[in-house]
Amino acid sequence: MSKKALLVISFGTSYLETREKTIGAIERDLQKGFPDHDFRRAFTSRMIIKKLRERDGEIVDIPHEALEKLKNEGYTEVVCQTTHVINGYEYDLTISELKKFENDFETLTIGAPLLTTIDDYNRVAKIAADELPQLKRNEAILYMGHGSDHHANATYPAMDYTFKFLGYKEIYMGTVEGFPSLDHIIPELKEKGYKKIYLAPFMIVAGDHAINDMAGDDEDSWKRILEAEGFEVECVLRGLGQFKGIQDMFLEHAKNGTSVRELL
């Protein structure tokens, strides 16, 4: 009889409360979709894994360690699902680790990151728009994405375009570490005459970036910078992983996963 496992691979977070609301919620939804699979968790951030071990005594595997254990425990069918937003460095690292095990299981599949196909962009735009407050006159929403120097950073301007294309003219996409930056967006917010800006994280978890870089009290936080520019600012500290529609998308990606053997 075959042994089946579900391995959910996330960047990770050291904020335990928001982890349960986001990564934990996605994991629970995936487990419901694969009831005959034993659940396993892995993080790709070595820094977060180290912090959890030293602070809480909690042990979380990297994908390689989790797969090694599954192989040694005799599992034959493994479904992997990443909770990464873009097909960036962390996803590349995940694939490189999975490829080492492509011949160790009868089946080893991986579901795509959140934003992979055109349909993904359209669906995420609608979900992200519906989950935030209804806008009044002279109000806008600014989502903060992580950003990257990986070519997959193109995801963020593409997402901004998708919002506008679908009619969400008052929703903007920025990044902390990529393009477009806040400096690129502020002039347009001023030109359009917005008075109030809702800030929200375009990240699975409302963790360190959301709490500090977005909503923090330091003068270089997005909240403080926008306030200094004359905007009223309200922060919405909810990660994308809290949205049921996003959880459902990850389940669909897992159900339609690609065999790791087929990946380059």
Task: Give residue ranges: language-model regions.
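Active-site-proximal alpha-helix that buttresses catalytic centers in soluble enzyme cores
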Residues: M1-L264
